[in-house]
Structures are given as C-alpha cells and as structure tokens.
Amino acid sequence: MQQPNVLPVDMKVLMNHIYEYQKGVRRMVLFTLNRKYEEFAIRRLESQNISYIVQPVGSDRLNLYFGREECLNAIRMIVTRPLNLLTPEEDFMLGTMLGYDICAQCERYCERKNRCTNQCNGNCDNQCKNAS
C-alpha cells in the first residue's frame, strides 16, 4: 500500500501562515525554515501570487518574509543585516510590523535600549547594535 504524501510539520506551519495571510489575519509573516524546503515554500508562495523576501540564516536555514508589498518594501530598508544585529529601534519596528504583542514589544525595546545604554554610555552607534 502506497503511503500518501505527508507534509513535514514546518510546511504545515507555512501553509497555516499562508492561510492566515490570505484571510487578512496577518499582513506580513516571518517564517524561518530549513533550506531544504526553500523550493517548496517559494513555489507555493508564487502559485498564490504572494510577494516574498528570502534572507539566509547561517548555512542551513532561511528567513522567509511574505505579505503585502508595502510591508516588504519597509523590510528591505529595515532588515539589511542578520536579525541579531538589528538596533533596538529596528527590532521594535520589525516586531510591531509582524503583529507581535505591542506591550511585549515595548518591554523588549526598553530592555534592549537600557542594555545598550549601559554598555556604551548612551552612544549606541555601532557598539550595541547586536544587543538582543
């Protein structure tokens, strides 16, 4: 007896994100996946006419942003380096754009900003960009 094609859990999560995006629950999604699923994920987004951006994360993972074009245009300007190197302000904007709990984002921002201020005496140009 032939076993039916079963989607890996990662791809089921992706399909749920696509469903939520199409239903208007989300305007933008950030999904981290194993590189081996890149072709499947991109093919699925393209078949649904959903815009996306791919950002490498290490050697075997990818960040896949997808959603409204105006959101992705902002992502192209904000996320110009790995996520762990974003400034507290960039991190806050990204989390807010992704629809994360606003109070949790505010708390995270204050924690990161205070850590940064404590590390570099208020001069958070380059030394503290990787505070996370």
Enumerate the language-model features and the residues they cover:
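Domain-length accessory/inserted modules outside core catalytic folds
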Residues: 1-132
